[in-house]
């Protein structure tokens, strides 16, 4: 690692009136480094980066570039220092071409006229350097979110940026798009760029980061190198308590009756004949690698996918589920994996999202009471129930969707990646909600790709491999090692 930091932020404070969002924060970043910045919502990550990018002016503190003090009061100052911030919400002009967006503010001109042909040539060179699949002449509005993100990165390269800041860049990307972004980030790092990466997704941080710095309550807590990365320590740094405290699994519930019993359920394709049991008051984990068939099995139970064989029992009675409505009528709720595409209505009010599953059953005049009660029970942070769902944080959106199923008075909850895309504080609250529902006798089937979550929350774990249940784990046998052994098809774990 280069001994001279490309960036040092020393004792940075930022006040909004009497409230201090940043309280003497330090951050050091080196050339050719992927540096993750972590912390709960409200920890100060985005505020610190906006100070760096000139969107905010620091109340006090200093910034050094290549070891020399550099005053950043405006975005122009930041650009002159080689700093580019890519926000969560793209800062692009959709009606303009890719080339025009890349060159915006630095257009080639001669005699007062923009040299469009040369602008296209220069923009295409940058696009080709990224390996992007679009052209400089394409309109930005025709591109996918991932491609628009590449345009933002291309603009940074066009400006000869040396420090690239990305704020939650994978929030709206598919797994394939995320993989491509990671490949690009690693390539840029190898070319000498310093990349600051704001994320709360542990898997991404482990895959990308050379170092991780953590903020909590507007203060710098510390940094860990790649060699010292540890999920438990990161969580402790972010929330001030150990990872084990997040799960709070001490439910002490006696063995309940078989609430959900699935026998040899299959769709003849993605899901081979699969059986599992979830008892009243228990949380059962469903683990496996991406593509193993976990989500598809949950969709079969909920009636989203058509079963070609097998049987489902609810409270000991055989049931036939052809549709989600039939599942809901049986007291089954389903939190989908992708809340923004399959579950959440972003333009609708929080109250309408919460009562979506109960409107056919309850009078509309009851909706306000139902939503108000759910907001209090799940501690959803909204100014009022009519606020637009799309304006809420990821954690509050997820709690809102969980509350939709709490509102139906469920017997069974199917939760597919219940804490995906939320910060550690929101995770802790979702775990609290799950434990409370289990104490009330709800049977919960939880799909998760986060092994600490599976181990920490589950009373029993089923592991899927290539569309089939590869094994079942109980008690002390629920370990990350045993789960991965089953998930990868090496079937020597003991249940």
Swiss-Prot record:
GO terms for cellular component: plasma membrane. SUPFAM superfamilies: P-loop containing nucleoside triphosphate hydrolases. Pfam families: ABC_tran. It is a peripheral membrane protein. InterPro entries: AAA+_ATPase, ABC_carbohydrate_import_ATPase, ABC_transporter-like_ATP-bd, ABC_transporter-like_CS, P-loop_NTPase. Its EC number is 7.5.2.7. It is an enzyme of class 7 (translocase). ATP binds at residues 39-46. Keywords: ATP-binding, Cell inner membrane, Cell membrane, Membrane, Nucleotide-binding, Repeat, Sugar transport, Translocase, Transport. It is found in: Cell inner membrane. Part of the ABC transporter complex RbsABC involved in ribose import. Responsible for energy coupling to the transport system. This is Ribose import ATP-binding protein RbsA. It comes from Shigella dysenteriae serotype 1 (strain Sd197). The lineage of its organism: Bacteria, Pseudomonadati, Pseudomonadota, Gammaproteobacteria, Enterobacterales. The gene is rbsA.
């Amino acid at each position: 690692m280069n001994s001279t930091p490309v960036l040092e932020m020393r004792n940075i404070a930022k006040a909004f009136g009497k409230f201090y969002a940043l309280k003497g924060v330090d951050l050091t970043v080196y050339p050719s480094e992927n540096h993750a910045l972590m912390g709960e919502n409200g920890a100060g990550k985005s505020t610190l980066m906006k100070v760096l990018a000139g969107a905010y002016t620091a109340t006090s503190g200093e910034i050094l570039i290549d070891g020399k003090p550099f005053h950043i009061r405006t975005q122009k100052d930041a650009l002159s220092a080689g700093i580019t911030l890519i926000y969560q919400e793209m800062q692009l002009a959709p009606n303009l071409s890719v080339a025009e967006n890349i060159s915006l503010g630095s257009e080639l001109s001669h005699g007062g006229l923009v040299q469009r042909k040369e602008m296209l040539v220069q923009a295409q060179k940058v696009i080709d350097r990224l390996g992007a699949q679009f052209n400089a002449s394409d309109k930005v509005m025709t591109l996918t979110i991932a491609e628009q993100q590449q345009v933002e990165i291309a603009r940074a390269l066009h400006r000869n940026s040396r420090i690239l800041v990305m704020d939650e860049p994978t929030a709206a990307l598919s797994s394939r798009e995320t993989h491509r972004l990671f490949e690009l980030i690693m390539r840029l790092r190898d070319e000498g760029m310093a990349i600051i990466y704001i994320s709360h997704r542990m898997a991404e941080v482990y895959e990308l980061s050379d170092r991780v710095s953590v903020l909590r309550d507007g203060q710098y807590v510390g940094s860990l190198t790649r060699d010292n990365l540890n999920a438990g320590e990161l969580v402790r740094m972010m929330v001030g308590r150990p990872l084990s405290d997040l799960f709070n699994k001490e439910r002490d519930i006696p063995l309940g009756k078989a609430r959900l019993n699935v026998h040899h359920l299959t769709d003849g394709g993605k899901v081979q004949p699969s059986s599992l049991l979830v008892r009243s008051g228990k949380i059962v984990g469903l683990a496996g690698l991406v593509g193993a068939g976990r989500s598809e099995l949950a969709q079969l139970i909920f009636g989203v996918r058509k079963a070609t064989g097998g049987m489902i029992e609810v409270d000991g009675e055989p049931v036939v589920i052809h549709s989600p409505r039939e599942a809901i009528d049986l007291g089954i709720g389903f939190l989908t994996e992708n809340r923004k595409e399959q579950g959440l209505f972003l333009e609708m009010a929080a109250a309408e999202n919460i009562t979506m599953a109960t409107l056919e059953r309850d009078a509309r005049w009851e909706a306000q009471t139902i939503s108000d009660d759910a907001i209090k029970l799940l501690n959803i942070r909204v100014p009022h129930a009519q606020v637009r769902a799309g304006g809420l944080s990821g954690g509050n959106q997820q709690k809102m969707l969980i509350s939709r199923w709490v509102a139906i008075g469920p017997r069974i909850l199917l939760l597919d990646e219940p804490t995906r895309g939320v910060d550690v504080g929101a995770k802790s609250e979702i775990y609290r909600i799950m434990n409370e529902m289990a104490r009330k006798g709800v049977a919960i089937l939880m799909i998760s790709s986060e092994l600490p979550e599976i181990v920490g929350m589950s009373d029993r774990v089923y592991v899927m491999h290539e569309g089939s249940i590869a094994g079942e784990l109980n008690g002390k046998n629920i370990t990350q090692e045993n789960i991965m052994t089953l998930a990868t098809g090496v079937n020597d774990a003991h249940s």
